[in-house]
Amino acid sequence: MTNPQPAIEGGISEVEIISQQVDEETKSIAPVQLVNFAYRDLPLAAVDLSTAGSQLLSNLDEDYQREGSNWLKPCCGKRAAVWQVFLLSASLNSFLVACVILVVILLTLELLIDIKLLQFSSAFQFAGVIHWISLVILSVFFSETVLRIVVLGIWDYIENKIEVFDGAVIILSLAPMVASTVANGPRSPWDAISLIIMLRIWRVKRVIDAYVLPVKLEMEMVIQQYEKAKVIQDEQLERLTQICQEQGFEIRQLRAHLAQQDLDLAAEREAALQAPHVLSQPRSRFKVLEAGTWDEETAAESVVEELQPSQEATMKDDMNSYISQYYNGPSSDSGVPEPAVCMVTTAAIDIHQPNISSDLFSLDMPLKLGGNGTSATSESASRSSVTRAQSDSSQTLGSSMDCSTAREEPSSEPGPSPPPLPSQQQVEEATVQDLLSSLSEDPCPSQKALDPAPLARPSPAGSAQTSPELEHRVSLFNQKNQEGFTVFQIRPVIHFQPTVPMLEDKFRSLESKEQKLHRVPEA
């Protein structure tokens, strides 16, 4: 597999590079000149002297090297090309044809006068004038023949049979006239032999070719240019075909690789197109992601993506509402989020011992909105150990409350399932649920506690009426907790004092005090 050409800056593909090269090569093609420009192929019309002269000069050295053409020439070099174009021009050939017709007419009249078929008063004087005019015209023809031999070369002139015949006709016409004139004077019937000059009328063909050959030669030059361009295009086509074959082979390899990986491109494309519509639908506050087994590494990573809550689930971020919920249950002016599983841990509010790894006691229970408040339908206890980093950033992260939705894998450790709760303890569960919901709704209780903003404490009357009842309910819940978890001896995790404690003391009292059982070794 050949390496394709490197891509140019700007991400230009290889096909565009090749097309640009083809355009440049096409523009750089010079006008094609004729090769082996022989005398018989020269046009007889007025040709561009620059083009024809340059071609003739390029072949001039080859003409000089021929045998028998080294004799002295009066017109050589660039003048030879100019004279050659002049001798082959259409204007000269037209003039020569006209002279041939004229000399034939004059010789015919002279012959008629000499044989006395044409008689008038001054016939003999007129015949003498016609004789000298015909002799001058034949002399011009002879001079033109000599000039052709000198300019074209003797061997080129001899190779052209038509030119040899034309020269012979001129000599046979001129020689008898000169001889009769010297012997008998202008009045001699032998002048009729000069009528052989009529054979030179064939130059009419040269005049016709003078208007046809230029067009023919021009078309031949254009054809040669197109043939060269065709050769270049064929080469480019072969290169492009090879590139297409290579790319097709790579595409087949990639498709085979995707088929081995069981990747469905159509399904992925449809899923990507449906993603904006799925994200635009209203959802709960949190989104559960597939995170696999919940261990220390996945616990440290953010596997829960928070989405924007709906307007119905928006709650007031006010400490007064949290305090009122803590004592009186959920307030009427605060919204309750849709059912979700919240994991409430005691390490979320452990802001006093950031460098000590604490055992977590978590309760996973779905929250439901009931007529009198939130009611718990199921309760499962799971223990996990999370080691927090000993840094300032870890203290800040550790102080935030963990109220994220997660999927808990079933525990591999066998243990007795908790017995079903009797109906008499629903009041206790509702109380504990109120406490957990109030804690789960606060995203960052430590920051609220450190906030210097004034807090509205509950009225003494309300607190006096509520605190003993809450203390009694919490004590009952702690007893039930110890009875329910027979395997894990857990001490009460929530303690209340008879008097109304400060907010900071409440958070400190919620710290975990259970025994460190089944610790996971740190990595």
Swiss-Prot record:
SUPFAM superfamilies for this protein: Voltage-gated potassium channels
Distribution of this protein across tissues and organs: Mainly expressed in the cerebellum. Also expressed in cerebral cortex, skeletal muscle and thyroid, but at much lower levels.
Subcellular location: Cell membrane; Cell projection, Dendrite; Perikaryon
Keyword Lipid biosynthesis: no
Gene Ontology cellular-component annotations: cytosol; dendrite; perikaryon; plasma membrane
Residue ranges, annotated region (Disordered): 380-477
Polar residues biased stretches: 398-411
Record's compositionally biased regions (Low complexity): 382-397
Key words of the record: Cell membrane, Cell projection, Coiled coil, Disulfide bond, Membrane, Transmembrane, Transmembrane helix
Segments on the Cytoplasmic side according to the record's topology features: 1-94, 143-161, 213-523
Residue ranges, Extracellular side: 116-121, 183-191
Its membrane topology: Multi-pass membrane protein
Top-rank lineage group of the source organism: Eukaryota
Coiled-coil region: 218-270
Listed GO MF terms: protein homodimerization activity
Record comment regarding domains: The transmembrane segment S4 functions as a voltage-sensor and is characterized by a series of positively charged amino acids at every third position. Transplantation of the transmembrane segment S4 into HVCN1, generates a functional voltage-activated proton channel. The coiled coil mediates homodimerization.
Known partners and oligomeric status: Homodimer; disulfide-linked.
Record-given protein name: Transmembrane protein 266
Organism annotation: Homo sapiens (Human)
